[in-house]
Design a protein with these regions (language model features):
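Conserved ABC ATPase signature
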Residues: 138-142, 146
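Catalytic Walker B motif of ABC-type/P-loop ATPase nucleotide-binding domains
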Residues: 163-166
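H-loop/switch region of ABC-family ATPase nucleotide-binding domains
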Residues: 198-199
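Conserved catalytic motifs of ABC-family nucleotide-binding domains
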Residues: 159
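ABC ATPase NBD Q-loop/coupling interface
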Residues: 64-79
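Conserved ABC ATPase "signature" region
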Residues: 116-134
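A short, flexible loop at the N-terminus of ABC-type nucleotide-binding domains that lies
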Residues: 1-4, 9-20, 52-57, 74-76
Length: 204
């Protein structure tokens, strides 16, 4: 469950100011944040995944954000990352490896998951998201849509209960958008909570 209570945030030099917002999202809900550029959609996603206040420098924050019982400003990022998976507008910004297989398992290895469990999560991810065509690939040889699909898979492998997607279709063509739509359908079927900041609504 996500609870945003009377939250205000103002960047030092950027748009995206929030003023006294309240938002409650129940487990399993899919919520789409829409609005003009600079209205604060991405800022809300950063409240949920902890980038605000843990990584965004400066700015003024007030109010309370609670994710699965954890007060975000008081919770270490690694604990938030166990619950909240983020897919960003530019997938290249979240890659840590050159080959696709290592990218899928990177988060699990970094979290100290035992090899047997890593193999199980890897196989479950490939099966659920139907990404066999991405395996054994060099990331630099992939299209933008394939990179986005791989980024989604690396998050899925971590098995978060909440997915946060920030403008995920911004750089995708029609086929890649349809692939993303199928992936979102899959996590909705599994009862995950989904928060999407988006300007395209037709694919949802």
């Amino acid at each position: 469950m996500i609870q945003i209570q009377d939250v205000s945030f103002e960047y030092e030099k950027e748009q995206g100011t929030l003023s006294h917002i309240d938002l409650n999202i129940q487990q399993g809900e899919c919520v789409v944040l829409i609005g003009e550029s600079g209205c604060g959609k991405t800022t809300v996603t950063k409240l949920i995944n902890g980038l605000i206040p843990h990584f965004v420098e400066g700015g003024t924050l007030s109010g309370t954000t609670i994710v699965n019982g954890m007060e975000v400003p008081k919770t270490e990022m690694y604990r938030l990352a166990e619950q909240v998976g983020s897919v960003f507008q530019n997938p290249k910004s979240q890659f840590f490896n050159i080959d696709s297989d290592s990218e899928i398992t990177f988060g699990l290895e970094n979290a100290g998951v035992e090899p047997k469990k890593i193999k199980e999560r890897y196989e479950a991810t490939v099966s659920a998201l139907k990404i066999q065509s991405l395996l054994g690939r060099n990331i630099f040889s992939m299209s933008g849509g394939e990179k986005q699909s791989l980024a989604f898979a690396s998050v899925y492998a971590m098995n978060p209960s909440i997915f946060v997607l920030d403008e995920p279709t911004a750089n995708l063509d029609a086929d890649a958008i349809d692939t993303l739509r199928q992936q979102i359908i899959q996590i909705k079927k599994e009862g995950r909570t989904v928060v999407i900041a988006e300007h395209r609504l037709y694919f949802l």
